[in-house]
């Protein structure tokens, strides 16, 4: 299940890498890929190596992509040359100086990562296992299968010992403490002898850039590493002939025991094969079960064991949070607590070798531990729990599911409730977290690399620290401050102001007009500025820019009601001047007729009217502008009256040309269509013949028979033409009545069709019109 879920996650991340060009997202996806347990099968099936390799020239993520591809390239040689490395490992181990031990641990951890990804996380289906065995050499197959099932046993044991994704804070922190088990028997031996050192100092081995990300992934998958951390003794309990033998040996006796360990492993290859087949069938049966049933069972087991182990775990977590990495004695106590957890699980007391092995830790490791301790001592002890809680909240949610089901990413994401803090405090706490993580993930020359790494991490934290400030951005629209004017006293004779739509056009001293059209419209009272706009474009924003004085309000009302002004009484001209400026000449003349006092002072207003209506005229001697305007206006009206009379007389004496007449006064009325058809059918149209047609003499009485025929035929042929000129006949309808008056109607003789004059005229006009084009 783990390998299948890893395959699904790799495919999802590969699709996101291809789709998303954002450098931050690309870096995030590459980091997720770097911490996944990638195997050669996954690389071959998904082709994710090519996808990541395409980013090697990217500006932001190019270096990370190159490191990741280089890390994946090491998978294949490590798997093929595993036996040779197993043989040469002990020799190189014995030759190295004591200060090179951390680098040796780094190589061991890298070998474990690669071999565990290749074997422990293989798919459970037989097809995948057969593909894997084809790629591996024949000598490696039993070793890989045996080691894969040791890993599975440890994983099952870790699920039973610790509740799935235990919510205790130590479970997430132990992910840092734990380094994964080795992939080969002698590596397992060396790692078991070094396990107290790992318990004493978190992450003594300092991984490469890719391994740093694997440690962060271990934080998220705290259950597996807690199980591995607590399951060191469990491995020894499951295989007592190996672990007890290895733990009782001192560290310096590794070379002597290599042959015995390899011999024992070969003797157990057959049994491990059978065990692998049995476990494979159990795993396939588990896969067939619904995932929800498996999750529920694991949750029940975890909850029951959590109740049993809560005292020991609480003690361990308290020790870990109060002074993590401060004193060796407290670390020995926490290791004893872990051993008590293992003893509850297995029923055996195997906690003795760990303290014994702790006494044999090399001095250089203790010195390095002192360096790490000085880094952690700089932080205040009170802020450490807060920082770690913040780390847990940021890195992952409180885990509630098992290891495999959490890897499948199929559970609904719960929204985290974060306390909104100021950006300064958030950056401060994240800075503390940064120092904590850096102090636990550097090797011997960490003192030189810390400043550079802190700079890189601060660059990443800047956008994260700026995020809490984003929701606080509120659009600051500056609202106009209303003037602090006291309200006037309420009067009994109160009349409300007119609608607010009209206010904007009546603001006094408005000089800046956008166009002459608006300037002209502003001169008329009671009109909106956009009165010609017929299309609705939103409600007009009409409001008072400032409170108008009582005088301004009165003048505005008077301007809007000039036609209602008659006698003004004793109101002086200076008060009425703004109103009189808006008056037309007729309105001004009417107001002056009602108030003769104003005539003496309105001469300037009449001057404006004279310049507008009579631009070229000048007043005569001793003539006021008012008198001039009235004189010129009277002269204009007289000229207009004279012109009107001349035009009327000219039209009256004009000879009448074409006159409109009624259509059928002196001619035959056109009968309706159905009546005309019946007349033609039955020959009953004689009554409609007018008197004019009868004026022609009938040629029947005199002359030979030849003459009447000719006369009748000529009259027959001439009558239609005459009729055409006499009236607006539009068809040959009344040809039958004409013929019936002279000659009896012959139904066998077809009537001659003639196009009506109006229709002929229309057709001619159409022809002329279209022929011109």
UniProtKB/Swiss-Prot annotation:
Changing residue 550 to S: Reduces transcription activity and abolishes heterotrimeric formation. Residues 549-558 are annotated as: BC-box. The keyword Translocase does not apply. One of its GO terms (cellular component) is site of DNA damage. Residues 79-93, 136-156, 249-265, 271-304, 317-339, 368-380 have a biased composition (Basic and acidic residues). Residues 239-248 have a biased composition (Basic residues). InterPro entries: Elongin-A_domain, F-box_dom, RNA_pol_II_trans_fac_SIII_A, TFIIS/CRSP70_N_sub, TFIIS/LEDGF_dom_sf, TFIIS_N. The modification Phosphoserine is found at residues 195, 310, 380, 383, 515. It comes from the Eukaryota. Keywords: Acetylation, Nucleus, Phosphoprotein, Transcription, Transcription regulation. SMART domains: TFS2N. The modification N6-acetyllysine is found at residue 430. Residues 4-79 form the TFIIS N-terminal domain. CDD domains: TFIIS_I (cd00183). Residues 79-480, 671-747 are annotated as: Disordered. Residues 565-609 form the F-box domain. The BC-box, which mediates binding to the elongin BC complex, has the consensus sequence [APST]-L-x(3)-C-x(3)-[AILV]. SIII, also known as elongin, is a general transcription elongation factor that increases the RNA polymerase II transcription elongation past template-encoded arresting sites. Subunit A is transcriptionally active and its transcription activity is strongly enhanced by binding to the dimeric complex of the SIII regulatory subunits B and C (elongin BC complex). As part of a multisubunit complex composed of elongin BC complex (ELOB and ELOC), elongin A/ELOA, RBX1 and CUL5; polyubiquitinates monoubiquitinated POLR2A. This is Elongin-A. The gene is Eloa.
